[in-house]
Curated annotation (Swiss-Prot):
This is UPF0053 inner membrane protein YfjD. NCBIfam families: PRK11573.1. Its main location: membrane. It is a multi-pass membrane protein. InterPro entries: CBS_dom, CBS_dom_sf, CNNM, FAD-bd_PCMH-like_sf, FAD-bd_PCMH_sub2, Ion_transp-like_CBS, Transptr-assoc_dom. PROSITE patterns: CBS (PS51371), CNNM (PS51846). Residues 2-192 form the CNNM transmembrane domain. Residues 1-3, 86-91, 151-428 are cytoplasmic. The keyword Cell inner membrane applies. Keywords: CBS domain, Cell inner membrane, Cell membrane, Membrane, Repeat, Transmembrane, Transmembrane helix.
């Protein structure tokens, strides 16, 4: 290289550093890309995204290509730097060139391009793919040889090389992504997405109207009583049964009954029974996600929940499931819960023992245990493992609870002292 001028060698050296920076930045940019955004861009027809996605299908080949290119360029730059140093400073130039080149490569060919690529992966990766794609084809024999040697060495060390890493997200990972997307997703939409993810964890038992609260009509009652119940029913559908709810025979749409009553034709018990729909039964313990699909598939909106013995346990509707996703359609607190809860001036809350724990937690942002019992009475009995007497105080989690009234082996009323006053809990 004696016939090449020192200036030319320095220019070539600078070019080598730039090429090294290109390989370093390309590697970081490719590996830090958001794969899901990349797939979306590729599906939208973005050519650069398609090219990058194709390169990333074989990450081992891409990494080998980048390392081969980077190392070849750095070795060449080291040789050129040594020659330039010796020309300028003699034998001492070797040490000077080594120190200067190490600093230059470290800063300008490693740290700087990789930092920029990590901050702006798309702006680096997409343009880089224009050169990397043809380079990969050109250097395929060398890349293949390097990968073959690497795989052989890994097998010798007992490392498996045929492991396929899934690119799909787990539910917990998806939950984390939703939590961290507050700047892009509104709080309400965020809550809805998280609720959808929670549907599989919840069953119809968690949201059903308990058997004791199901309102139905005994068809053995006198006709005037039946008409009066239909006229004053606040529900869209009502269960028709014979003597006992366990002998439920059909589900009547109240609006259809009103329509028949308004017509000139005579509205009789037989007419009512013919207008009623067959009862749809839901097995106890069915996940909400499964039941929502079944409601849709069977074109049903309400079902009676039964246990393994066929006994009716409660009633569940499509609206109940949808409210778990989007929140209550009416008020922040259900009418039933509003009757069961009485806030006190001292920040405590008097609650009926039959109140649903999940509804209380949702309404007041509390954290009472929900896994083992559905009602306040059940939660306290589960904690005490005995029936308490009035005046007993129990601490469940962070809540002090006074037992106010016990009747018929059941806790009728309690007073809960939350850590934060009720207004603060609801505000959060």
């Amino acid at each position: 290289m004696e016939h090449i001028s020192t200036t030319t060698l320095i220019i070539i050296l600078i070019i080598m550093v730039v090429i090294s920076a290109y390989f370093s930045g390309s590697e970081t940019g490719m590996m830090t890309l958001n794969r899901y955004r990349l797939r979306h861009m590729a599906k939208q027809g973005n050519r650069s995204a398609k090219r990058v996605e194709k390169l990333l299908r074989k990450p081992d080949r891409l990494i080998s290509l980048v390392l081969i290119g980077n190392n070849l360029v750095n070795i060449l730059a080291s040789a050129l730097g040594t020659i330039v140093g010796m020309r300028l400073y003699g034998d001492a130039g070797v040490a000077i060139a080594t120190g200067v080149l190490t600093f230059v490569v470290l800063v300008f060919a490693e740290v700087l391009p990789k930092t920029i690529a990590a901050l702006y992966p798309e702006k680096v990766a997409y343009p880089s793919s224009f050169l990397l794609a043809p380079l990969q084809i050109l250097m395929m024999p060398l890349v293949w040889l390097l990968n073959a040697i690497t795989r052989m060495l890994m097998r010798m060390m007992g490392i498996k090389t045929d492991i396929v890493v899934s690119g799909s997200l787990s539910k917990e990972e998806l939950r984390t992504i939703v939590h961290e997307s507050r700047s892009q997703i509104s709080r309400r939409n965020q809550d809805m997405l998280l609720s959808v993810l929670d549907l599989e964890k919840m069953t119809v038992d968690d949201i059903m109207v308990p058997r004791s609260e199901i309102i139905g009509i005994d068809i053995n009652d006198d006709w005037k009583s039946i008409l009066r119940q239909l006229s004053h029913s606040p529900h869209g559908r009502i269960v028709l049964y014979r003597d006992s709810l366990d002998d439920a025979i059909s589900m009547l749409r109240v609006r259809e009954a009103w329509r028949l009553m308004s017509e000139k034709k005579e509205f009789t018990k037989e007419t009512m029974l013919r207008a009623a729909d067959e009862i749809y039964f839901v097995p106890e313990g069915t996940p909400l996600s499964t039941q929502l699909v079944k409601f849709q598939r069977n074109k049903k909106k309400v079902g009676l929940v039964v246990n393994e013995y066929g006994d009716i346990q409660g009633l569940v509707t499509v609206e109940d499931i949808l409210e778990e996703i989007v929140g209550d359609f009416t008020t922040s607190m259900s009418p039933t819960l509003a009757e069961e809860v009485t806030p006190q001036n001292d920040g405590s809350v008097i609650i009926d023992g039959t109140a649903n724990v999940r509804e209380i937690n949702k309404a007041f942002n509390w954290h009472l245990p929900e896994d083992d019992a559905r009602t306040v009475n059940g939660v306290i009995l589960e904690a005490l493992e005995e029936i308490p007497v009035a005046g007993t105080r129990v601490r469940i989690g962070e809540y002090d609870i006074d037992i106010l009234d016990v009747q018929d082996n059941m806790i009728k009323q309690v007073k809960v002292f939350p850590v934060k006053p009720l207004r603060e809990s609801v505000a959060e």
